[in-house]
Structures are given as structure tokens and as C-alpha cells.
Amino acid sequence: MTAFGVEPYGQPKYLEIAGKRMAYIDEGKGDAIVFQHGNPTSSYLWRNIMPHLEGLGRLVACDLIGMGASDKLSPSGPDRYSYGEQRDFLFALWDALDLGDHVVLVLHDWGSALGFDWANQHRDRVQGIAFMEAIVTPMTWADWPPAVRGVFQGFRSPQGEPMALEHNIFVERVLPGAILRQLSDEEMNHYRRPFVNGGEDRRPTLSWPRNLPIDGEPAEVVALVNEYRSWLEETDMPKLFINAEPGAIITGRIRDYVRSWPNQTEITVPGVHFVQEDSPEEIGAAIAQFVRQLRSAAGV
């Protein structure tokens, strides 16, 4: 039976990016293995997966701006924490961390869009990509299960502000609702901590669903996702697709589509969306094997 550790992995470090303090984990030595979370999580999501990679490289996990232990933006409001703003902060942090030229990316949720985008811009620096419950193509509302569709349509309406900023729906309902097991109070409190204050401190959890590429909007994110998926569906870059069963955003036609990507290994593990909280040992072991094969092929 899987043991679900509650303690964070490693010791947080901090760098100032554009006047804001950003938090990250940076443990071990060697070529970088970069774990990137999405909404509404943090590097805490990877706590039970990163130990499986010890000894295989430098393990890096960053907290997006306004999330985890990273600073909030001020002033805040509806125009803050867009995909573009999040990307600018994260890519600047990755640049400052000097990740090297043999990077393995481990991606989830919005971390996948950011990582796929970065990989597309730095193709010669990426050795391989592991991804799970990722943003692999623009979506339509028909791709969403009815039970979830209404909530996300709500986020993209004027009701989004009270839902997210007042009632903290993304943390209190969406997060635990997309995990098969029940998180402990201690685990939930780690995820609550960045958003304990109501109002604008919770803005990132609302801006992210408003940036999802659904039915052609927002156009700039749809264009971005189409740009990186056009590359991913033809590149021989080694890929590990960690398929969640039953899954949430890679299901149906989208699952069929992603299975067409070349030079890709697939495993299936139990999970909905936050699959790291249900199957960390299976995920960690699969990524470790993937990295060993990459390093061996490269003669490292």
C-alpha cells in the first residue's frame, strides 16, 4: 500500500525575480530534472515523487508567482496572473537557475503549458518530457464532464470572483474533488496556506481557469497551445505520457490524440486530475526509469 508522506520535499530557496521573491526546491547534483506544478498547487505536489529521482540529477521544483511560497503580485486584479505574466516570471526564474543543456521536464496542469512552451523555445536543451493531466491541445466545452463543466463556466463568468476569491472553491472543492483518496487535514492545509486570505491573494486560482483554451478563447492562449502541440506531434523528443484512469482533462478524443505523438512511452495509473496525490510511487518509478534510459542513451 502506498504511504502518502505529508512533509514537503527539500528545503525552500528563494530568488528575486522582477522585484518579487520566488520560491523553489533545488536538491542534488547533475543534469536538471524540473518538476512544474499548475493550479492551485505548488512544489508540494511533487513531495512523494521527487525522492524516486534522487541520485539521477539535480531536482528542481518552482512555485509559480502568487502560488506556494512565492510572493503575490501587487497591485492585483482581473488582469494579473495571466498566462503571459506567469510565463515571464517562471522563465526568468529558470534562466536564473541555469538549468543547463540536458533538462528533463516533469509537467502537470498549467505547468505543462509552461513547460511545453519553454521546450519549444529551447529544443536543443531538453532531453525528454514526462507529462500527466496536461494541456495538450485547445479544448471545447464538450470535452468537459458535465459535473465539472458548470463549475469552470462559472469561473469564466462574473460569478468567478465570489467563487474563487471569496469561497476559495478551487482549493476547497476542485482540488479534493479531483483526487481519489481523501487528503489529510495536514495535506489540505499545505495547499490552503498560500490562499488563506480571501480576496486578491486568491486571484491566481481564478486567472488560471479564465486562461484555459476553450472554444477559441482566450485567443492568445489557443494560439500558444497550437504552436507547441504542432511541434510535439512531430518531434522525436522522448516523451513519457502518464495516463490517469479515469483522468479529467486527458480523456476521450484528447487521450486518443496525445497517443499519436511520436517516440512516446505510456503508463496508466489510478487518478483523476491531481494524480500525484493518488499514485506517487508508480509515477516516481516510471519517471526514474524514463530518466535512466535517457541518461544511458546519452552516455551520461
Swiss-Prot record:
Enzyme Commission numbers on file: 3.8.1.5
UniProt keyword annotation of Transport present: no
The keyword Phosphoprotein belongs to this UniProt entry's keyword annotation: no
Domain AB hydrolase-1: 32-155
Cited InterPro entries: AB_hydrolase_1 (IPR000073), AB_hydrolase_fold (IPR029058), Epox_hydrolase-like (IPR000639), Haloalkane_dehalogenase_2 (IPR023594)
One GO molecular-function entry: haloalkane dehalogenase activity
Cystine pairs: none
Broad EC category: hydrolase
Keywords: Hydrolase
Reactions catalysed, as given in the entry: 1-haloalkane + H2O = a halide anion + a primary alcohol + H(+)
Active site: D109 (nucleophile), E133 (proton donor), H273 (proton acceptor)
Domain of life: Bacteria
Subunit structure: Monomer.
Function: Catalyzes hydrolytic cleavage of carbon-halogen bonds in halogenated aliphatic compounds, leading to the formation of the corresponding primary alcohols, halide ions and protons.
Family per record: Belongs to the haloalkane dehalogenase family. Type 2 subfamily.
Name used for this protein in its record: Haloalkane dehalogenase
Annotated organism of origin: Mycobacterium bovis (strain BCG / Pasteur 1173P2)
Gene that this sequence comes from: dhaA
